[in-house]
């Protein structure tokens, strides 16, 4: 049987990959994917702690479903914003997203 430490290490690796993608990437789609990867790492932590700490309660699973719902809404809104900026600027480079400059 897998231990809690295994899930925590996997979640930490996923979160670090997401942070790396968030810092390094200049593409808006990759940034959104990195944020989703970080949220999935958080969900893995919720599920692991819910299973190993108190397996009788389902609070971790319920909160994980809530985070998945919010992440789906965030992805939809983020992609809509990126699509709108792409139609105006013809690029999805994060450096050109500064809409306050003329």
Swiss-Prot record:
Subunit structure: NDH-1 can be composed of about 15 different subunits; different subcomplexes with different compositions have been identified which probably have different functions.
Protein name: NAD(P)H-quinone oxidoreductase subunit 4L
Compartment(s) where it occurs, according to its Swiss-Prot or TrEMBL record: Cellular thylakoid membrane
Family classification: Belongs to the complex I subunit 4L family.
Gene3D superfamilies registered for this protein in UniProt: 1.10.287.3510
Example of a GO biological process term: ATP synthesis coupled electron transport
Catalysis performed (reactions): a plastoquinone + NADH + (n+1) H(+)(in) = a plastoquinol + NAD(+) + n H(+)(out); a plastoquinone + NADPH + (n+1) H(+)(in) = a plastoquinol + NADP(+) + n H(+)(out)
Broad class of the protein's primary localization: membrane
Membrane-traversing stretches: 4-24, 33-53, 65-85
InterPro entries the record matches: NADH_UbQ_OxRdtase_chain4L/K, NUOK/Mnh_C1-like
Organism annotation: Synechococcus sp. (strain JA-3-3Ab)
The organism's taxonomic lineage, starting at the top: Bacteria, Bacillati, Cyanobacteriota, Cyanophyceae, Synechococcales
Function: NDH-1 shuttles electrons from an unknown electron donor, via FMN and iron-sulfur (Fe-S) centers, to quinones in the respiratory and/or the photosynthetic chain. The immediate electron acceptor for the enzyme in this species is believed to be plastoquinone. Couples the redox reaction to proton translocation, and thus conserves the redox energy in a proton gradient. Cyanobacterial NDH-1 also plays a role in inorganic carbon-concentration.
Entry membrane topology: Multi-pass membrane protein
GO MF annotation, one: oxidoreductase activity, acting on NAD(P)H, quinone or similar compound as acceptor
């Amino acid at each position: 049987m897998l231990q809690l430490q295994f899930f925590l290490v996997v979640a930490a690796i996923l979160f670090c990959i997401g942070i790396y993608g968030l810092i390094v990437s200049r593409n808006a789609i990759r940034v959104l994917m990195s944020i989703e990867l970080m949220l999935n790492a958080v969900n893995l932590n919720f599920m692991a702690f819910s299973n190993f700490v108190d397996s009788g309660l389902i609070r971790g699973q319920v909160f994980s479903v809530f985070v998945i719902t919010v992440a789906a809404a965030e992805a939809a809104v983020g992609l809509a914003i990126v699509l709108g900026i792409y139609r105006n600027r013809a690029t999805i480079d994060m450096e050109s997203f500064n809409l306050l400059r003329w």
